[in-house]
Regions:
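Short acidic-glycine-tyrosine-enriched beta hairpin
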Residues: 88-105, 201-226
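Histidine-centered metal-chelating micro-motifs
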Residues: 65-68, 100, 104-111, 174-176, ...
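Bacterial N-terminal signal peptides that target proteins for export
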Residues: 2-13
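Bacterial N-terminal signal peptides
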Residues: 12-22
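N-terminal, post-signal-peptide region of Sec/Tat-exported proteins
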Residues: 48-92
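Sec/Tat signal peptide C-region and signal peptidase I cleavage site
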Residues: 23-27
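Glycine- and acidic-residue-biased ligand/ion/polar-headgroup-sensing regions
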Residues: 71-89, 182-205
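Double-stranded beta-helix
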Residues: 29-37, 52-55, 109-161, 232-258
């Protein structure tokens, strides 16, 4: 009887070890895939009435001061410092590596915390005719980084989602499947990596030669509909991207090549 009990215990321990090993393998597999974190999301009722652009700017607000924004749909990402964003009666604190959506045609007050300037990245979705207008009023100082004219075939009739997301691909992870956007996106590189591009491919066929190019911190990448590509990290550090995306409401942001 004691012998049988020992066999059962040994069997139970073996099965448990196999089960835990399987869970570990699954966890490692999951960890190797891209990790997407949505930081901010807004809704745009129409984007086909006039040519549209995505504009990216770096904004600095001195500590203890406030800037008022009233303009196009906007997304802000806090690089350093901290801010308090007030829209009507809604007040929200936003710290480093966090983001917020700023609605259009509304006074938005952005107050930088005492002691240090707040450094922001600001995406604006605006009419191309308004792209030269300043991103934010004094005392904020603004440096325009990039303007992307959104191709007409990237936008459809009806409401669209305007979102900001960080994408992290773990160090040494394999390259995700080639894909394109269903709308358009503008990326800012937060940690180095590589992009592979298929210039001759389309959403039905991965054809033609590919080329790989390094992207460093601060680099900017346009991703319109039909741009077939994939990102990959370095072997020893993760790839981190900040993405502003515009896509039709109810439609997946990403289209994988068949």
């Amino acid at each position: 009887m004691l012998h049988d009990l020992r066999i059962r215990i040994r069997f139970t321990l073996t099965v448990s070890a196999i089960f835990l090993s399987s869970l570990s393998a699954v966890a490692q597999t999951v960890e190797k895939g891209p990790v997407r974190t949505v930081l901010a999301l807004g809704r745009v009722s129409s984007v086909v009435d006039t040519p549209m652009s995505l504009k990216l700017s770096r904004v600095s607000i001195p500590g203890g001061t406030s800037a008022v924004y009233r303009g196009a749909h906007s997304l802000v990402y806090v690089v350093s410092g901290a801010v308090t964003i007030t829209v009507a009666n809604d007040l929200r604190s936003v710290g480093p590596k966090q983001g917020a959506y700023l609605p259009t045609a509304t006074d938005v007050t952005i107050h930088a915390s005492e002691g240090a300037a707040a450094e922001l990245l600001q995406y604006q979705l605006l009419r191309s005719a308004d792209a030269s207008k300043p991103a934010m009023n004094p005392p904020a100082s603004v440096t325009e980084l990039h303007q992307m004219k959104i191709p007409a075939d990237s936008l459809k009739p009806g409401p669209h989602e305007f979102s900001m997301t960080t994408v992290m691909i773990p160090a040494g992870a394999s390259r995700p499947r080639p894909h394109t956007r269903s709308g358009a996106a503008l990326y800012y590189v937060l940690a180095d990596g590589t992009i592979t591009i298929w210039p001759s491919a389309n959403i039905d066929t991965l054809s033609g030669e590919s080329r790989s190019e390094s992207r460093r911190i601060g680099d900017i990448q346009e991703e319109p509909y039909g741009f077939i590509h994939s990102w990959s990290p370095k072997a020893d550090v993760p790839l981190v991207l900040l993405q502003a995306n515009i896509s039709q409401e109810g439609v997946p942001e990403i289209i994988f090549v068949k």
